């Protein structure tokens, strides 16, 4: 198991913080040096930050690019694509992430499920939609509570058993 999560990492937008914060740039480094039976792509919400502001079409193209990189560099790996839960506007507005996310970010986050589902079908990825499982915490509008993390883990475990 290689855990490659990173705070504030974007999936497909060039992050001003550099290569380690930009998913499509750092992903090949992991894929070229490791063999993975299963790759979990649970990324994308940071691309909706107000100063990046991609259209939904750009979002879809960016996530597709990430899947294509994964398929090209690790063709035998199975992919689980995880759609993030919709952001919580009240939590965003009242929390520490209001400088990064806004009402438009929240609205777009609520429209990601069909994009992820369509890409999962197109590229034959397993698909988990967190919107059907948990909501983000109202404390910051972005992250999950410990209870929600447990629920996500249990659902991911079930999916992994089916995938293997």
Regions found by a protein language model. Give the residues of each.
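Histidine-centered active-site loop/cap adjacent to the catalytic His
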Residues: 1, 140-164
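Short acidic/His/Gly/Ser-rich catalytic and metal-binding motifs that mark active-site loops
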Residues: 10-11, 48-50, 88-93, 135-138
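Conserved SGNH/GDSL esterase-like catalytic core that processes O-acyl groups on lipids
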Residues: 1-75, 107-110, 143
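Alpha-helical elements of Rossmann-like donor-binding domains used by nucleotide-donor carbohydrate transfer enzymes
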Residues: 25-26, 58, 65, 115, ...
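Short coil-to-beta-strand
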Residues: 33-42, 78-83, 123-128
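Active-site segments of SGNH/GDSL-like serine hydrolases
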Residues: 42-48, 69-106
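Substrate-gating cap/lid alpha-helix
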Residues: 88-130
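Residue-level recognition of beta-strand->loop/alpha-helix junctions
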Residues: 3-5, 83, 129-131
